[in-house]
From Swiss-Prot:
NCBIfam families: fdhD_narQ. GO terms for molecular function: sulfur carrier activity; sulfurtransferase activity. InterPro entries: Cytidine_deaminase-like, FdhD. Mo-bis(molybdopterin guanine dinucleotide) binds at residues 258-263. PANTHER family: FORMATE DEHYDROGENASE, SULFUR CARRIER PROTEIN FDHD. GO terms for cellular component: cytoplasm. The keyword RNA-binding does not apply. SUPFAM superfamilies: Cytidine deaminase-like. Required for formate dehydrogenase (FDH) activity. Acts as a sulfur carrier protein that transfers sulfur from IscS to the molybdenum cofactor prior to its insertion into FDH. This is Sulfur carrier protein FdhD. The gene is fdhD. Belongs to the FdhD family. Transmembrane segments: none annotated.
């Protein structure tokens, strides 16, 4: 399997996922110059030779994305159920070929048959509210976080956004320990993809105590993905949706929105927050 390492800040000469283009800047006078733009490419996740989904993503940390997506979508329950990940760039995008165990591949094929005929716009085709929620084992209450350390974590978030610092165009997802230290993280033009990348990296690291911190809002998908991977606390820099709060309540996840210096809004299960 491709090696997965925590992302850290790189020099601009080493930046992957961004390109310089000629632009016309207007301040007082219009002047031609170069500017950095974040890359966005189609990325196909292919399981045992069958294309499962195509996502728009920043082309970095794609092995981590494949592992995190597989875990957060319930395709696998352990990294050991993926035997290999191979990344193949092409003319129209990137293929990430994932070799699944035979048992998990059989489960994926059955799941694809059950979804046949549904449209591809999220919850379209679902007949009742309960069908929206992926079966998630309620999380235990083993974690705690002191909000005094949140400012420390927020101050470090840009460390995992080298492309974002150049372009202003990426979301970040990071793992922070109970002292607010940022242990690692990822960025992407898509907030869900950034989170999947982080969850893939975390699956290969001994990070148990701590929480997820994302630079975006918290949608119900973000909550489900976090809970599916066993993380008990999710901090979002922006707001949470009503459905995100409902899902968090159901699966025992502590959801915190408006995570900014000196403030935070705890929506669910505040017993983990000090």
């Amino acid at each position: 399997m491709s090696q997965i390492k925590p992302s850290r800040l790189s020099s601009s000469a080493e930046i992957r996922g961004a390109r310089q283009l000629d632009v016309l800047q207007r301040h007082k006078l219009a002047e031609p110059q170069q500017d950095w733009l974040a890359e966005e490419v189609p990325v196909a996740l292919v399981y045992n030779g069958i294309s499962h989904v195509v996502m728009m993503a920043t082309p970095k940390d794609l092995a981590a994305f494949a592992l995190g997506f597989s875990l957060s979508e319930g395709i696998i329950s352990s990294p050991q159920e993926i035997y290999a990940i191979e990344i193949t760039p092409g003319c129209n995008g990137i293929e990430v070929n994932i070799e699944l165990s035979s048992r998990r591949f059989a489960g994926l094929k059955e799941r694809r048959r059950a979804m046949a005929g549904r449209t591809g716009c999220g919850v379209c085709g679902i007949e009742q509210l309960d069908d929206i929620f992926r079966p998630i084992t309620p999380l235990p209450f083993t974690q705690a976080f002191n909000l005094e350390h949140l400012d420390t974590a927020l101050a470090q978030l840009k460390q995992v956004q080298p492309v974002g610092q150049l372009t202003g165009c990426t979301h970040a997802a990071a793992w922070i320990n109970p002292e607010g230290e940022l242990l690692g993280g990822c960025e992407d033009v898509g907030r869900h993809v950034a989170l999947d990348k982080l969850l893939g990296i975390r699956a290969k690291q001994p990070w148990q105590q701590g929480a997820v911190l994302v630079s975006s809002r918290a949608s119900y998908e973000m909550v489900q993905k976090t809970a599916m991977c066993g993380a008990e606390i999710l901090f979002a820099v922006s707001a949470a949706t009503t459905l995100a709060v409902e899902v968090a309540e159901r699966c025992n996840l502590t959801l915190v929105g408006f995570s900014k210096p000196g403030r935070a809004t705890v929506y669910t299960h505040p017993q983990r927050i000090k």
